[in-house]
Design a protein with these regions (language model features):
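PLP-dependent enzyme catalytic core of the Aspartate aminotransferase-like
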Residues: 2-6, 10, 21-23, 29, ...
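Conserved N-terminal alpha-helix of the aminotransferase class I/II PLP-enzyme fold
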Residues: 55-103, 125-130, 136
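Conserved PLP-anchoring active-site segment centered on the Schiff-base-forming lysine
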Residues: 113-131, 160
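Conserved C-terminal alpha-helix-loop-beta "cap" of PLP-dependent enzymes
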Residues: 116-118, 310-311, 315-383
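PLP-dependent aminotransferase-class I/II
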Residues: 141-179, 183-188, 193-200
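Active-site C-terminal subdomain of aminotransferase-like
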Residues: 150, 177-178, 182-185, 192, ...
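Catalytic PLP-binding core of fold-type I/II PLP enzymes
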Residues: 193-225
Length: 383
């Protein structure tokens, strides 16, 4: 799982950036004697972007709506309202939108809806569907065919070459058929596809009749990043399916699966249920996305995470730390020696990524919609 920007090749990969093993985890002040009158300082957590509950506006809306009876399975008025908000946001009035319980379920459902039973999905080696979905895609009958990652991204020329090799193989009738392409925005390393890159990938996909799927588990952090030159409408124009992540961007849980050109398969509700992605109390998802997409709340809270990450990134650079991967979003990857890991993780939760050949650890610092200025200042002081 190496990046083209990484100076060292990992000797043993422990995990990828989407889910991590946390290290340490007790604040040093929590070990104070029981007789001490000073309260223990709260543990700093920069482990991931799903450690907090939900934005207060969502909790208020859920509380206000708590005793309103509604029909189930996403057939309610609030899911319809959230769907219309998404359609306006992406400038696709006929888009088919479903609210699903989580990211793995969403990816499994989307791929199974798009690919034939013998179809495979093409992804880079570091892709979430290849590394951290416990074989969910394969369990639904779809092989994951991998290409090299380049700072977490897919090269369109390598995708075209893979298709050429498959088409030229006289035995391809006996092989899993490349049937769709999966990428993430932002990537597992927090990097971004720029508009030219995504357009190039989309061109190859359409020339080969391969639906393009964009995993947007961290879409808010991508679109809000200073280096992002695309909009949600651009993604809807270039992709055949994508998700709008809620779990990692302010919601309690849930992802919106969006098909800009309409439903990809008949009886989608049955397919969604088959993959364990259908929530009986579907309005709980609708309420959350209705709030997130009202008055730009989704992007506003994502900007906070990116701003906090930018401040940490500058501090790391100023202090001479080696940052790996050219992320401009809420994920920062830094190579640390064992002593520094021990010192920092005695005071703050970080994510362990992998062990590098030179013995250092690749650690992730991850901000979220809920990260405060004070938390960022306290982390920087520890560096």
């Amino acid at each position: 799982m190496t990046s083209s920007t990484s100076p060292a090749t990992p000797a043993a990969t422990a995990t990828t950036a989407s889910e991590t093993h946390s290290t340490s985890f007790t604040s040093s002040t929590s070990a104070a004697p029981a007789t001490s009158s000073a309260p223990a300082a709260p543990v700093l957590s920069f482990e991931n972007d799903y450690s907090e509950g939900a934005h207060p506006a969502i909790l208020k809306a859920l509380s206000d709506d708590n005793l309103t009876p509604r029909p189930g399975y996403g057939t309610d008025d609030v899911c319809r309202s959230a769907t219309e908000r998404i359609r306006r946001w992406i400038k696709q009035p006929e888009a088919y939108v479903r609210f699903l319980v989580g990211g793995t379920q969403a990816n499994q459902t989307i791929i199974d809806a798009i690919a034939p039973p013998f179809g495979a999905v093409v992804a880079v080696t570091s892709a979430h569907v290849n590394t951290h979905e416990a074989g969910a895609i394969e369990a639904s009958g779809h092989k994951v065919i991998t290409l090299p990652e380049h700072d977490g991204k897919m090269d369109p020329d390598e995708l075209a070459a893979l298709c050429d090799v498959f088409d030229a193989d006289d035995n391809n009738e006996h092989m899993a058929v490349p049937s769709c392409v999966y990428v993430s925005q932002s990537t597992e390393y927090g990097t971004l596809y720029d508009l030219d890159e995504l357009e190039g990938l989309s061109r190859v996909c359409r020339s080969r009749h391969l639906p393009l799927i964009v995993d947007g588990a961290r879409l808010g952090y991508a679109l809000a990043a200073a280096g992002c030159d695309m909009t949600a409408a651009d993604i809807a124009r270039l992709a055949d399916a994508f998700t709008i992540g809620g779990t990692k961007v302010g919601a309690l849980f849930g992802e919106a699966a969006v098909f800009p050109h309409g439903a990809p398969a008949p009886r989608m509700t049955a397919l969604i249920k088959r993959h364990g992605a259908l929530l009986a109390k579907g309005w709980l998802l609708g309420v959350q996305f209705d709030v997130l997409l009202d008055d730009d709340l989704y992007l506003d809270i994502a900007r906070n995470a990116d701003r906090q990450a930018d401040a940490i990134r500058r501090a790391l650079t100023d202090r001479g730390y080696e940052i790996m991967h050219s992320s401009s979003t809420n994920q920062i990857f830094v190579a640390l020696d064992a002593r520094t890991v021990s010192r920092l993780t005695s005071r703050v939760r970080l994510g362990f990524m992998e062990r590098l050949d030179d013995g250092r650890s690749l650690m992730r610092i991850c901000t979220s919609w809920a990260t405060t200025d004070d938390q960022t200042r306290r982390l920087i002081a520890l560096l």
